[in-house]
């Protein structure tokens, strides 16, 4: 069942689990150059260091927040009305778009007039779609190349910096040891960024709006922000920024309802999904997507060929350019921010997959391969690519050029079909850039660790540093049920090498449609991989959160340890399985080692002894050894004593 008959728009409500703030956290907003540039962040409050450890103040930590208004107690959430149109005034003020009299897509008009879908439709949209005025280009890349810094670019610069400078200043002002504390907490290991411009000796001290503009103008970063998705909070995808992650959701022909997919979206962004892809393949795709977009503060991506295939009852050979074009316009006018389009699957590459272990595993890739073979013609996506660009730039939809020939097993990694398609994607990127259309490139797949860097190096070369967006890659094929881990390993590596966004993999990969728990597991695993990549690249400020958590751990501030982690709920749950009492939250040990074998407790004891003796820690250890030596001789120099 793909549309739960119990779902009625009149009864729709937000998932209560998605709206509560995380423990000891609150939503804060940083205002930009104009009052409506209000950039959300999550402020994590910390306890003061106990007197026994120095009695220091620990100011709040600020972290990137993708949850939108859902975790803001002051926001009124009604998913039947959708989110506020945050960017609407910015879009209108540019004066290069117009409101349409109605939907342009034939299919969109048919759905709006179909009484059978009346009870499923999103009821809260009271505006018509927008499109570029004749002769205008409304992409963020076009503005960037004109030297224009948009409000979206300023928003992103503030967001990427995460108030790092303010945090260090608050440390300096925290007490007599403030300067020393700021130096310690701001310390970071040098990274290896493999030539990325934002790292190393020439790195900017902070991300500026001008830096954002320049990266977008060069094509090294994209801002997915359809003019018909004004509810979205601007974000950026590029190798010189924080590594982002995507969460896939969507119904299928056999399971899930509209309500469940909206819940998955709100759950995914709560835990850190930077973008969400709706990969629905069942009925009511149009209605499901509308509900998701209107309630999403993050960019939404789709694979339009999936819906086009539904329109021809699943028969790939009956697809036409006209049906696909209408689908693009339908989705662009709903507000989809980026389209995965498998225009690199060319007729000449299909035979190259014949000797693969797992053939063509991409759904979109297999659809286009079947069409090419059925008609023995070049793909209509490839043939009509410039026309697709014209549609994209009228709504500012970004390309996510699909890897339809990605390897589905490590056996097939880096083969001729995969790399041939990648080279074609580089050629298509140049065509899109000619139209000032934003582009990112999708990548594999299943790749053993020793072949991952080759993928990244070839992509940077052939696609001229357009952002890379990879599914993992999975580094081994032996762990069904654990592919969030097999892929998380590859994701951390390729993120370090330069991938800009990682598409999450859940434990259900290859096995079934993920539920909410699987979504969270995939998100947390990939947030971890992305952060590890930021650390390895030497992203400015990436280590601040690690330093704060390590300090909390050493000072036995258990609540702060939980709250500074990626998943406070799980950390607290694991701790409380063995030490559930409140008193354990201030204990100087955990259940791993107990009170007598805690390495950190022993270190603290050494420091206390040193302070009492008025000597250094090294001298304290030496003095302690001497005391024990005297005790040993006095006891008879016996290693063992009979009881």
Swiss-Prot record:
Q: Which UniProt keywords apply?
A: 4Fe-4S, Iron, Iron-sulfur, Lyase, Metal-binding, S-adenosyl-L-methionine, Thiamine biosynthesis, Zinc
Tell me which cofactor or cofactors this protein depends on. [4Fe-4S] cluster
Q: Which InterPro entries match?
A: ThiC, ThiC-associated_dom, ThiC/Bza_core_dom, ThiC/BzaA/B
Any idea which positions bind substrate?
248, 277, 306, 342, 362-364, 403-406, 442, 469
Q: Which residues form a coiled coil?
A: none
The record's annotation in PANTHER family points to: PHOSPHOMETHYLPYRIMIDINE SYNTHASE, CHLOROPLASTIC, THIAMINE BIOSYNTHESIS PROTEIN THIC
How are cofactors bound according to the entry's free-text note? Binds 1 [4Fe-4S] cluster per subunit. The cluster is coordinated with 3 cysteines and an exchangeable S-adenosyl-L-methionine.
Q: Which residues cross the membrane?
A: none
In what pathway does it function? Cofactor biosynthesis; thiamine diphosphate biosynthesis
Family membership noted in the UniProt record: Belongs to the ThiC family.
Q: What is the lineage of its organism?
A: Bacteria, Pseudomonadati, Pseudomonadota, Betaproteobacteria, Burkholderiales
Pfam family example for this protein? Answer: ThiC_Rad_SAM
Q: Name one GO cellular component term.
A: cytosol
User: What is the protein's name according to its record?
Assistant: Phosphomethylpyrimidine synthase
Protein residues bound to Zn(2+)? 446, 510
Task: Describe, as the record does, how this protein assembles with itself and its partners.
Answer: Homodimer.
């Amino acid at each position: 069942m793909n549309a739960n008959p119990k779902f009625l728009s009149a009864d729709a409500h937000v998932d209560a689990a998605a709206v509560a703030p995380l423990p000891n956290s609150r939503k804060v907003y940083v205002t930009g150059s104009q009052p409506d540039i209000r950039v959300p962040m999550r402020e994590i409050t910390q306890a003061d260091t106990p007197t026994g450890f120095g009695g220091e103040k620990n100011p709040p930590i600020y972290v990137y927040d993708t949850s939108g208004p859902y975790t803001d107690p002051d926001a009124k959430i009604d998913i039947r009305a959708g989110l506020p149109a945050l960017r609407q005034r910015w879009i209108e003020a540019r004066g290069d778009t117009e409101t349409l009299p109605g939907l342009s897509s034939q299919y969109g008009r048919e759905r709006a007039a179909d009484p059978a879908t009346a009870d499923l439709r999103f009821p809260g949209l009271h505006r018509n779609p927008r499109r570029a005025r004749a002769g205008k280009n409304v992409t963020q890349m076009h503005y960037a190349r004109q030297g224009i810094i948009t409000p979206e670019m300023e928003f992103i610069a503030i967001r990427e910096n995460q108030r790092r400078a303010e945090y260090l200043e608050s440390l300096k002002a925290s007490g007599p040891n403030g300067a020393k504390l700021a130096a310690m907490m701001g310390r970071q290991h040098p990274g290896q960024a493999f030539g990325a411009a934002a790292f190393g000796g020439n790195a900017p001290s902070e991300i500026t709006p001008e830096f954002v503009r320049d990266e977008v103008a060069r094509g090294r970063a994209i801002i997915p922000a359809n003019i018909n998705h004004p509810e979205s909070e601007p974000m950026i995808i590029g190798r010189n920024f924080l590594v982002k992650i995507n969460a896939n959701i969507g119904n299928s022909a056999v399971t899930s309802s509209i309500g469940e997919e909206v819940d998955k979206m709100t759950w995914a962004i709560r835990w850190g999904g930077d973008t969400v892809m709706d990969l629905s393949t069942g009925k009511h795709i149009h209605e499901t997507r509308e509900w998701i977009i209107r309630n999403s503060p993050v960019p939404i991506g789709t694979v339009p060929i999936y819906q086009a295939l539904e329109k021809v009852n699943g028969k790939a050979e009956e697809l036409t350019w006209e049906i696909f074009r209408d689908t693009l316009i339908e989705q662009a006018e709903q507000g989809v921010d980026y389209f995965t389009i498998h225009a690199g699957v060319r007729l000449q590459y299909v035979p190259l997959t014949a000797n693969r272990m797992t053939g063509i595993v991409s759904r979109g890739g297999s659809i286009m391969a079947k069409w090419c073979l059925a008609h023995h013609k070049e793909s209509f996506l490839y043939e009509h690519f410039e026309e697709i660009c014209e549609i994209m730039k009228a709504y500012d939809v970004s390309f996510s050029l699909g890897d339809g020939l990605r390897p589905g097993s490590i056996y097939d990694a880096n083969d001729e079909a995969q790399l041939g398609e990648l080279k074609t994607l580089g050629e298509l990127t140049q065509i899109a850039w000619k139209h000032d259309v934003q582009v990112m490139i999708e990548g594999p797949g299943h790749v053993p660790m020793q072949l991952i860097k080759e993928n990244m190096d070839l992509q940077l070369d052939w696609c001229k540093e357009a952002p890379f967006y990879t599914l993992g890659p999975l580094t081994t094929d032996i762990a069904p049920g654990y592919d969030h881990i097999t892929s998380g390993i590859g994701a951390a590596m390729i993120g370090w090498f330069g991938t800009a966004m990682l598409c999450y993999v859940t434990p259900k990969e290859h096995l079934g449609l993920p539920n909410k728990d699987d979504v969270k597991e995939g998100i947390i695993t990939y947030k971890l991989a992305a952060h590890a990549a930021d650390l390895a690249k030497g992203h400015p400020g990436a280590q601040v959160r690690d330093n704060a958590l390590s300090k909390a751990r050493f000072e036995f501030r258990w609540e702060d340890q939980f709250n500074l982690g990626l998943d406070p709920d799980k950390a607290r749950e694991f701790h409380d399985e063995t030490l559930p009492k409140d008193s354990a939250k201030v204990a100087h040990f955990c259940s791993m080692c107990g009170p007598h074998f805690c390495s950190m407790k022993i270190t603290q004891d050494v420091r206390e002894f040193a302070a009492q003796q008025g000597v250094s820690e090294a001298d304290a250890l030496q003095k302690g050894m001497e005391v024990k030596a005297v005790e040993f001789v006095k006891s008879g120099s016996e290693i063992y004593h009979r009881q």
